[in-house]
A protein has these predicted regions:
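Active-site-flanking beta-strand signature of metal-NTP-handling nucleotidyl enzymes
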Residues: 2-8
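Short, surface-exposed ligand-recognition loops at beta-strand->loop->(often short) alpha-helix junctions
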Residues: 9-17
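Short, acidic/polar
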Residues: 20
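Short, glycine- and small/hydrophobic-rich beta-strand elements in well-ordered beta-sheets
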Residues: 26-48
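An amphipathic, aromatic/His-enriched active-site/gating alpha helix that lines ligand/cofactor pockets
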Residues: 30-36, 55-88
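Amphipathic, hydrophobic secondary-structure cores in small proteins
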Residues: 51-52
């Protein structure tokens, strides 16, 4: 299993623009055979922070997700609003592969 959290600090006022596109990307991603979970959350402590929690059956399934045109377009769109970006792999001790 390949599970991770992405935390994105955004330029002020960018959150709504990203959320407008995020729902469609979420729908498409959840339909991928290798996707186990694809969720995003607004941060209650910081209105300019967006958090994604994603889980794929494998690192390869995530790589395939990254090759999808809708994924590339969504990333290219929201990157222009980044102030910070953190990617953290998460899991239990027995999921370190």
């Amino acid at each position: 299993m390949y599970k991770f959290v992405i935390s994105i600090g955004l330029k002020p006022g960018a959150l709504e623009q990203i959320l407008q596109r995020a729902l469609e990307v979420q729908r498409l991603t959840r339909a991928e055979a290798g996707c186990l979970a694809y969720d995003f959350f607004t941060c209650t402590d910081d209105p300019d922070r967006l958090v994604f929690i994603e889980c794929f059956v494998s690192k390869e399934a995530h790589a395939l997700h990254c090759e999808q045109q809708y994924t590339k377009e969504f990333i290219a769109f929201h990157e222009q609003f980044h102030v910070s970006f953190t990617f953290e792999r998460i899991g239990t001790d027995n999921s370190r592969h």
